[in-house]
Amino acid sequence: MIREYGKDREKAAQLVENVGEALARMKQREETVLAVLAADISGNPHYFDRGTAAGQLLVNAICCQEDRELPKGAHEWRDLLLQTGIAPDPISSSVHVYGLHLLTAQGEHPAYEAFCRRKEASVITLENLKGVTGARAGGDTVFVVENEMVFCFLVNALSEKDEGELTLLCISGQPRTAALKVLSLLTEGGYRILYNGDMDPEGVDIADRLWKRFGQMLEIWRMSPEDYRNGISGEQVGAKRLSRLCHMENSILRETAVQMRKTGRAAYQENILKDLLEDLAVYIKSK
């Protein structure tokens, strides 16, 4: 920043203002594509590209704000942006799905119909959603999990028993635009959404924000204080992370947050896999 200031004071001031605007938008937790964000703020879609002064200052500011180390290489750079709601490109924004039918003006999307027939999981990117007008689940309920390993375990355990009733999504941590768009299509179609995530400060925060976004169409699944006790780990959670739990609005998550602040420990989906699996098996059997 000092180097840029030495070159041109006015441009340096504009640089700081633009990065500040990007950080302010990130706080709204609405994911955007990097080029779109850059063009909207500066008029140049490459303004925040890796290697530019603005791009470097943005990364430094994110790391300072999130108390993280600077990324080493392109892979860590992409991960950092994705975790803070900025997709480097339309393909990076994605959601993993099982048993989900996508609808277009021409009818059901043939590629995703093939995955459903084969009982295989697939990936939907933001690019794939161009031209998609709706989404159809196998039953009246859609189950959503936070972590990939949990998603894969459940699909592998249940795909042979499933006769087309089960629809399962994985948002992979902070939900990308692709995931939010698919969830919006499902709630618009009247489907009930059950969401389960890690019971650490970040996971509970994700669940609470999804609940606030989708209202009564989304229910919190297996994240109660009892589930927290069943899934508790030995991992200690620092005071800074625990402070994120002070503003939960969902009543179930608020009670779980109280328990977490008392114990100072995180609980994970992997520790309640049997409960999740049993819930899905009961759902399939009931259809």
Residue ranges and their predicted role:
Residues 191, 213-219:
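Structural alpha-beta junctions
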Residues 1-170, 175-188, 202, 208-212, ...:
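Nucleic-acid enzyme cleavage-core boundary/entry regions
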